[in-house]
A protein has these predicted regions:
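Structured-RNA-binding interfaces characteristic of tRNA pseudouridine synthases
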Residues: 1-147
Length: 147
């Protein structure tokens, strides 16, 4: 799982710890509507870095919550696996589509294209991206205390 924190304004206090996309105006409602269409299994070729060594780009997003948190917009994303740059491209592309007031059909077209160089795909800055959890479904950990 990942958390992405996006600032609406860049300040000296948040500039190193939050993402900021200048010249982007977006609405929380629009982001949430677009995000609903990414839940489930999809081919995320368009929303990840092009890598010919990765044969399968299908990932299952089980959670994509977007909400106001303090003076930030917070994205909570959980999936069965993540591709390189996938979270940052999801965030950047959702913000870009919201900025241009484009709807879910445009997002579905981006996914269908399977083109990481698609013109509407934007990569959000690395600042603001946080790993929040790792789960291995079939892993049984030995709970024996360390000496």
């Amino acid at each position: 799982s990942y958390i992405y924190l996006l600032a609406r304004e860049k300040t000296p206090l948040n500039r190193l710890f939050t993402g900021f996309m200048p010249r982007s105006k977006f609405s929380l409602e629009s982001l949430q509507t677009l995000a609903e269409h990414l839940l489930g299994s999809h081919d995320f070729s368009s929303l990840s870095r092009d890598n010919p060594l990765v044969p399968n780009h299908i990932c299952t997003l089980s959670k994509l919550d977007i909400y106001e948190w303090r003076d930030l917009v917070r994205f909570d994303i959980t999936a069965d696996r993540f591709l390189h740059n996938m979270v940052r491209r999801i965030v950047g592309t959702l913000v870009n589509l919201s900025h241009f007031d484009l709807g879910p059909q445009e997002l579905l077209n981006i996914l269908a294209e399977k083109n990481p160089r698609q013109r509407l795909v934007v990569t959000a800055p690395a600042q603001g991206l946080y790993l929040s959890g790792v789960r291995y479904p079939n892993l049984q950990l030995d709970e024996t205390p360390l000496p």
